[in-house]
């Protein structure tokens, strides 16, 4: 899950309450919380019951990739999530984290260890939003059309529509949850055609973008 920042909000004044150092590691983190994350919208993953989708290709796709943990919704504490992003900082190849006086780091490798996912057979470095190739062939393979990006109007089959919704909410949860953007189209195509996806690097990349 990740927040959508609300930047450009009114700056806190000198009359603002003193920093609560049980919640924030510094005054700067407190300011970041009030300026960006306090009113941020938290994007929540959807709980997906694979046993209800056994008549589709979806369970096999997630089981063969060992991604089933990404479909299990856990308890959500909105205040902790917002504090996490306010206190976190990107330090090269890791994220320095601080939550309620507990310090830790997040790396691509720590995400992989937590999710118990095998790494790809070879490094995959291209981020989906940086992919410049034409997506026309991908769209046609998926059953869509280039002129339609709204999930309400794309002429997907029921199976593909379900897979796309799972992908958008649980694997690529950025701001607009009703649009199949070009990066999401590439991700969905790679998922559907069984291409290797470095999901741990992808999650790490999305986390860094949200900080």
List PLM regions with ranges.
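A structural signal for long, well-ordered, hydrophobic/aromatic- and basic-residue-enriched core segments
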Residues: 2-211
């Amino acid at each position: 899950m990740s927040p959508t920042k609300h930047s450009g909000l009114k700056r806190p004044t000198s009359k603002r309450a003193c920093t609560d150092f049980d919640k924030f590691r510094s005054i700067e983190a407190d300011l970041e919380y009030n300026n960006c994350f306090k009113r941020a919208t938290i994007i929540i993953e959807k709980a997906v019951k694979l046993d209800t989708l056994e008549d589709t290709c979806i369970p096999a796709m997630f089981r063969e990739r060992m991604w089933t943990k990404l479909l299990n919704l856990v308890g959500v504490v909105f205040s902790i999530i917002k504090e996490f992003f306010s206190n976190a900082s990107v330090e090269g190849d890791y994220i320095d984290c601080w939550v309620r006086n507990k310090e830790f780091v997040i790396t691509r490798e720590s995400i992989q260890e937590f999710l118990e996912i095998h790494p790809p057979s070879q490094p995959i470095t291209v981020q989906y939003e940086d992919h410049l190739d034409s997506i026309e062939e991908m769209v046609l393979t998926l059953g869509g059309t280039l002129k339609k990006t709204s999930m309400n109007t794309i002429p997907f089959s029921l199976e593909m529509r379900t897979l796309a919704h799972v992908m958008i909410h649980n694997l690529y949860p950025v701001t607009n949850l009703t649009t199949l953007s070009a990066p999401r189209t590439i991700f969905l195509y790679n998922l559907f055609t069984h291409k290797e996806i470095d999901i741990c690097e992808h999650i790490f990349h999305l986390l860094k973008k949200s900080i």
